[in-house]
Amino acid sequence: MKARLLVLLCALAATDADTICIGYHANNSTDTVDTVLEKNVTVTHSVNLLEDSHNGKLCRLKGIAPLQLGKCNIAGWILGNPECESLLSERSWSYIVETPNSENGTCYPGDFIDYEELREQLSSVSSFERFEIFSKESSWPKHTTGGVTAACSHAGKSSFYRNLLWLTEKDGSYPNLNNSYVNKKGKEVLVLWGVHHPSNIKDQQTLYQKENAYVSVVSSNYNRRFTPEIAERPKVRGQAGRINYYWTLLKPGDTIMFEANGNLIAPWYAFALSRGFGSGIITSNASMHECDTKCQTPQGAINSSLPFQNIHPVTIGECPKYVRSTKLRMVTGLRNIPSIQSRGLFGAIAGFIEGGWTGMIDGWYGYHHQNEQGSGYAADQKSTQNAINGITNKVNSVIEKMNTQFTAVGKEFNNLEKRMENLNKKVDDGFLDIWTYNAELLVLLENERTLDFHDSNVKNLYEKVKNQLRNNAKEIGNGCFEFYHKCNNECMESVKNGTYDYPKYSEESKLNREKIDGVKLESMGVYQILAIYSTAASSLVLLVSLGAISFWMCSNGSLQCRICI
């Protein structure tokens, strides 16, 4: 019996066998990603797809400065409000900047017809040529061209728009006028004019020498006849009269004709337009700085190659797509679950089931071995590189497909188009929700696939080792194998590179397996003997105890015993 127990203890003491484990990289990263099934999964590596920062500045766009309207708005600039005179020299720009509270627009009160459409047209213009369409000195010889008003005062004196002429009577007469212009600029020409509506007949007769007047404007695409509406109105900027402002785009080679017998606010300067990709109009209080950018928002410039941003829906230039997301992070590495580096009964290192290895820094997947010569980590470079190439190509493909750089400007609606504006906002919100949903779903799905891909690669590496070793080693859990033979560093390297010589070690493994199996049988015999002795001893103790209790109870009369023959 003693000999058998000694054999068992010796066998248990001699099982410090060589081992090899398959596992994956872990590090101290705190990056988290979301997948379809999980949230906030900690991973070793990831890339951010969502830009959420800007510099708070207005910058040059591709080296070209914006047109800052300052205290003027589009109307004041394009009509030539005297307070916007400094803008008359501007010829080109990358984008146009209005401030939210610009005060200088139409100085003489009235309606700017189709103003929102004009803003939309100008948002795609990157430069223009301002030229005299009708000469102030020679085009209207029978009319006075110096009409001014206190509503458009400048430097304390009455003045008028720098791009329009207020034609009035001359020497007590206002003869019919008829003038035309042929567009020979080779590009679209923006022409502006106005129609004056006095507040009373007296002003009408004083200015135009007649009570009934008309204005006619005709081109190949435009044909309107205007009749002044004479009526008392509340004073605005000290004026009871009104001027309605009009515009049209004249195509190359087209002719525009003006005919009137009063009340015409005639064109003086017009604009030959040059359209450019990426221009636009933004409303911003940000200040201009010495900086360059490829993407400008009202909040500030964005310098990013990421496919998405959540800064502002209005963008100028080559900009990421706006989404409402707060996080779009795509995993490129593995689940980051560093294992507790503890030694077990056989000195095994926790493998890929329990967690990754922070000690393996030169690859994503690899091995940890232990033998008489020592222990160490080694990455499987081939599987790691294949995974890196595949994931890099996938990330680049996703970014390329989603990274459609473009300008997104707000649409213009006037006060009478609120229903249309509200409908447009709902449609835009719907598209924005779809874009946001698609972006988030894409990232969730790709993250799930990437993590599954890594799990599959680790499993494939495990199966590769298992298929080589076959019954020359046994699986001991945690991604580890215990050899039935001695495996030095050369042997370990052959397992890692796939050249393990199974027949070379099969005989030694067979003998060691038989020894271990024999020890198991011997130990089974020992356990059976111990079990029999234990059962017999327990039964004997129980019988003696029962006899003693019975004798005591009989002696004090608690139990009566009768023997019948």
UniProtKB/Swiss-Prot annotation:
Homotrimer of disulfide-linked HA1-HA2. Interacts with human CACNA1C. InterPro entries: Capsid_hemagglutn, Hemagglutn_HA1_a/b_dom_sf, Hemagglutn_influenz_A, Hemagglutn_influenz_A/B. Residues 1-17 form the signal peptide. Pfam families: Hemagglutinin. Belongs to the influenza viruses hemagglutinin family. The keyword Cell division does not apply. GO terms for cellular component: host cell plasma membrane; membrane; viral envelope; virion membrane. The record marks 343-344 as: Cleavage. GO terms for molecular function: host cell surface receptor binding. It is found in: Virion membrane; Host apical cell membrane. One of its GO terms (biological process) is clathrin-dependent endocytosis of virus by host cell. Disulfide bonds join 21-480, 59-291, 72-84, 107-152, 295-319, 487-491. The lineage of its organism: Viruses, Riboviria, Orthornavirae, Negarnaviricota, Polyploviricotina. A lipid is attached at residues 554, 561, 564 (S-palmitoyl cysteine). It is a single-pass type I membrane protein. This is Hemagglutinin. The keyword Transmembrane helix applies. Major glycoprotein, comprises over 80% of the envelope proteins present in virus particle. Keywords: Clathrin- and caveolin-independent endocytosis of virus by host, Clathrin-mediated endocytosis of virus by host, Disulfide bond, Fusion of virus membrane with host endosomal membrane, Fusion of virus membrane with host membrane, Glycoprotein, Hemagglutinin, Host cell membrane, Host membrane, Host-virus interaction, Lipoprotein, Membrane, Palmitate, Signal, Transmembrane, Transmembrane helix, Viral attachment to host cell, Viral envelope protein, Viral penetration into host cytoplasm, Virion, Virus endocytosis by host, Virus entry into host cell.
